[in-house]
Amino acid sequence: MPPATGDIDRQIEQLMECKALSETEVKMLCEHAKTILVEEYNVQPVKCPVTVCGDIHGQFYDLIELFRIGGSSPDTNYLFMGDYVDRGYYSVETVSLLVALKVRYRDRLTILRGNHESRQITQVYGFYDECLRKYGNANVWKHFTDLFDYLPLTALIESQVFCLHGGLSPSLDTLDNIRSLDRIQEVPHEGPMCDLLWSDPDDRCGWGISPRGAGYTFGQDIATQFNHTNGLSLISRAHQLVMEGFNWCQEKNVVTVFSAPNYCYRCGNMAAILEIGENMDQNFLQFDPAPRQVEPETTRKTPDYFL
């Protein structure tokens, strides 16, 4: 049964103060979110106006700053292009808040899957350890990583702007190819679903081997052809740190949006979000990090053994 509106509103209020939910609340939240996300599409249609956001990576106070700059949810419609967890100190609170907002305002918020929304990656880059530290077990990690399998892979704003975390795939020429994928699974090591979450644009033409070890690099010729074939004006993606928070490339066929300022608390970059207005007009809002909070104790407590 869906949670009462009052319950979810109370949870959102609590999360806005960076106070984590109980394990039971997370379990119920994820179960409800699954019932919403399972009905969404691999290419989820989105109407304008909408504000498009890139990586957040557990930088909770910078997410609050994003909402301050861009407008609160649900007053502003948002589309997040993945990578909510890992690296920052507050992955639990960050992903909990975004999922709670999705459950409360399902038509006002679109949350896509990033390459970090995966069991394997989160065990290496911090989310798993954070869940153990904050809850004393891995149950919350399991609830969220099971939910991640349901996240849409891409979104399409007014049939014109194609949004996704990473980039294109040599296996996928059309949006219909993407629509036919079975997405409800762990991110594979290779293949089209992996490519959408891992690939990057590149200055060289054609397809290239990615230095990331997953996905591909794709040239301007590839992006131009993909946009032409599918009647698109723009590919909007995240996945790469860009110092100004946004970066046009490939003759403005592709834009990278990155929304974690001073990434990893040391990169010195600005963050940005992309406002797409009623008439599909585009406006970038840049922002600096929120004032530093007291960092939590992040020493890794290694359990005596792993079950």
Swiss-Prot record:
Cofactor: binding comment: Binds 2 manganese ions per subunit.
GO molecular function: metal ion binding; protein serine/threonine phosphatase activity
UniProt catalytic activity: O-phospho-L-seryl-[protein] + H2O = L-seryl-[protein] + phosphate; O-phospho-L-threonyl-[protein] + H2O = L-threonyl-[protein] + phosphate
Record's subcellular location: Cytoplasm, Cytosol; Peroxisome
Superkingdom classification of source: Eukaryota
GO terms of biological process kind: regulation of auxin polar transport
Catalytic residues of the enzyme: H116
Induction, as annotated: Induced by salt stress.
Post-translational modification: Reversibly methyl esterified on Leu-307 by leucine carboxyl methyltransferase 1 (LCMT1) and pectin methylesterase 1 (PME1). Carboxyl methylation influences the affinity of the catalytic subunit for the different regulatory subunits, thereby modulating the PP2A holoenzyme's substrate specificity, enzyme activity and cellular localization. Phosphorylation of either threonine (by autophosphorylation-activated protein kinase) or tyrosine results in inactivation of the phosphatase. Auto-dephosphorylation has been suggested as a mechanism for reactivation.
Cross-referenced SMART domains: PP2Ac
Residues at which Mn(2+) 2 binds: D83, N115, H165, H239
Chain sites annotated for binding Mn(2+) 1: D55, H57, D83
Residues with Leucine methyl ester modification: L307
InterPro entries, per database record: Calcineurin-like_PHP_ApaH, Metallo-depent_PP-like, PPA2-like, Ser/Thr-sp_prot-phosphatase
EC number: 3.1.3.16
Protein role: Associates with the serine/threonine-protein phosphatase PP2A regulatory subunits A and B' to positively regulates beta-oxidation of fatty acids and protoauxins in peroxisomes by dephosphorylating peroxisomal beta-oxidation-related proteins. Involved in the positive regulation of salt stress responses. May function by increasing chloride channel activities on vacuolar membranes.
Quaternary organization: PP2A consists of a common heterodimeric core enzyme, composed of a 36 kDa catalytic subunit (subunit C) and a 65 kDa constant regulatory subunit (subunit A), that associates with a variety of regulatory subunits such as subunits B (the R2/B/PR55/B55, R3/B''/PR72/PR130/PR59 and R5/B'/B56 families). Also interacts with CHIP and TAF12B. Interacts with B'THETA. Interacts with CLC-A, CLC-B, CLC-C and CLC-G.
Similarity-based family: Belongs to the PPP phosphatase family. PP-2A subfamily.
Protein name, per record: Serine/threonine-protein phosphatase PP2A-5 catalytic subunit
Organism: Arabidopsis thaliana
Gene expressing this chain: PP2A5
